[in-house]
């Protein structure tokens, strides 16, 4: 009996040791690929299967580290086989993973694909990572021809847009701020939100930007966001008037139900169009 227990204990120790060695090897390979991007160490099928087993194990409660490594290895595997569309599926909504993958793949992922990935990550905490921000800043030349397909019809064909921004930066620094919006209510909402969570006093800026200088337009979160770098002009500071009651109602209606969310998106577009027409008629946009 004691011999069996000893053998079992020895097997467990060996398994723990082998797990430790494998995790360290995976971590080391990722770090090497991140630091030296000229030659990428391809993840092995054994490493991926090892992580899959850990992620599926009911005996392990905290699996986030293993998921973190797994996403990177699968993205590396996709980039090394030229499966560009697959890369995003492994890092969607994971800005930290995405920043690492973009750095590792900077020499092999085509620039337009890097642009697409960086823009999708930027709007979801990606502004915290230089690897993402630097691609966004230099992304204008990789902007697709249909970059404005999600833009409201009432402004889509304009050559120049009026944009707004809430920020703590001084007016002379605002030109290099990446995130602006077509809708003043969005900027007013961000100003209130930032101050509510203890950030510095927010300024509300208004500017114009040529369509040719826009890096991207995104509306995945109903923020009507214009992404730019150094393209805005005629910047002025506006008095804060607060968020409109209609926008507050719209924001409070945010839903994770797909059909309800689609309904809210339509409502947002309608409200924006109404606001745009009213202010355009008054010459205030």
Task: Tell where the protein language model's regions lie, with residue ranges.
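Conserved NAD+-utilizing ADP-ribose enzyme module
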Residues: 2-162, 169-178, 184-285
């Amino acid at each position: 009996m004691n011999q069996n227990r000893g053998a079992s204990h020895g097997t467990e120790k060996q398994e723990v040791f082998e797990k430790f060695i494998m995790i360290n090897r995976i971590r080391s390979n990722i770090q090497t690929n991140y630091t030296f991007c000229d030659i990428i160490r391809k993840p092995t099928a054994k490493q991926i299967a090892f992580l899959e087993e850990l992620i599926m194990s009911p005996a392990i409660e905290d699996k986030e580290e293993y998921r973190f490594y797994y996403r990177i290895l699968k993205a590396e595997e996709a980039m090394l086989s030229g499966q560009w569309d697959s890369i995003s599926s492994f890092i969607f909504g994971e800005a930290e993973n995405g920043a690492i993958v973009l750095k590792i793949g900077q020499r092999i992922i085509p620039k337009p694909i890097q642009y697409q990935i960086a823009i999708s990550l930027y709007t979801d905490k990606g502004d915290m990572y230089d690897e993402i921000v630097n691609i966004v800043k230099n992304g204008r030349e990789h902007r697709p021809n249909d970059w404005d397909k999600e833009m409201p019809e009432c402004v889509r064909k304009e050559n120049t847009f009026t944009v707004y921004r809430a920020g703590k930066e001084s007016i002379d620094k605002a030109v290099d701020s990446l995130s602006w919006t077509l809708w003043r209510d969005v900027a007013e909402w961000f100003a209130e939100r930032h101050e509510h969570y203890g950030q510095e006093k927010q300024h509300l800026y208004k500017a114009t930007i040529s369509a040719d200088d826009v890096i991207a337009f995104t509306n995945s979160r109903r923020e009507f966001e214009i992404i730019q770098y150094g393209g805005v002009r005629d910047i002025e500071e506006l008095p804060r008037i607060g968020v409109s009651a209609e926008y507050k109602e719209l924001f409070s209606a945010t839903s994770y139900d797909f059909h309800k969310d689609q309904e809210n998106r339509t409502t947002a577009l309608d409200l924006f169009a109404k606001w745009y027409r009213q202010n355009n008629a008054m010459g205030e946009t």
